A protein has these predicted regions:
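Short charge-dense sequence patches
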Residues: 45-52, 173-183
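Short, small/polar residue-rich loop motifs at catalytic or cofactor-binding pockets
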Residues: 186-189
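Short, acidic, Ser/Thr-enriched surface-loop or helix-capping motifs
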Residues: 195-196
Length: 223
């Protein structure tokens, strides 16, 4: 989505929301001009939420990542062992931990949410999580006990001021070809909508393929 079209969407959305989630499917940090998009959000007095795999943190300066428009950064740590990468675990975690340290050193007001969405009854990611929890425990002087977390299933644990680690089960993107729909609910059209890069308006971010097209945002006013 080019900047001109993005600004037109933000301008039209202003009467309806105060927050913009800068992704539907994908990683907003792959955009080299992310700062320009954040400038537009800030221009209209809105807040941005960035959700990233963590792989592209080093592509951006802290002036961008801590842009005054950014309300929170969500980092999906479980993406490390679900993607082919030449990075070692330590190389992957280094910019994540550096970001957290810089947030504290600079007294930035945004939230950093570290997501660990890979918990299951079989503890299939036990080895990865054990290493991850040891790393986070050491970095933040907070004990993250693997067995306790699996047993008690906390939603989140505070690591430091506005830095939290969040836990959940595996997330699977919905598909019409999937026979198991599960029991989840969606707040699409109640609390939010999504706009794809093509301009299609859909009920929520789960409809990344535009199956339920409500409007073509390029030609139809947002209202």
């Amino acid at each position: 989505m080019d900047l001109h079209f993005f600004e037109s969407i933000i301008q039209q959305a202003k009467p309806y929301t105060k927050e913009i989630a800068c992704h539907v499917l994908g990683d907003p940090l792959t955009q080299s001009n992310l700062h320009d998009y954040l400038d537009i959000i800030h221009k209209y007095g809105m807040k941005a939420m960035l959700t990233t795999s963590g792989y592209f943190l080093k592509k951006h300066s802290y002036d961008t990542l801590f842009h005054p428009a950014v309300k929170q950064i969500n980092i999906s740590l479980n993406s490390f062992n679900k993607n082919d990468t030449s990075l070692t675990f330590d190389q992957y975690m280094a910019p994540v931990l550096s970001l957290c340290k810089a947030k504290l050193d600079r007294n930035e007001d945004l939230f950093i949410n570290l997501r660990v969405w890979n918990l299951d009854e079989m503890m299939s990611e036990r080895l990865f999580n054990e290493r991850l929890f040891l790393t986070l425990s050491s970095a933040f002087d907070v004990k993250l006990d693997l067995d306790t977390i699996y047993h008690e299933k906390p939603k989140s644990i505070r690591l430091d001021s506005k830095i939290l680690v969040h836990f959940d089960n595996y997330f699977e993107w919905p598909s019409l070809s999937n026979k198991n729909y599960g029991d989840g609910t969606c707040q699409g059209l109640q609390s939010h909508i999504a706009i794809l890069a093509s301009g299609k308006v859909v009920p929520c971010c789960l409809d990344c393929d535009g199956v339920i097209e409500l409007a073509e945002g390029i030609h139809v006013p947002f209202s």
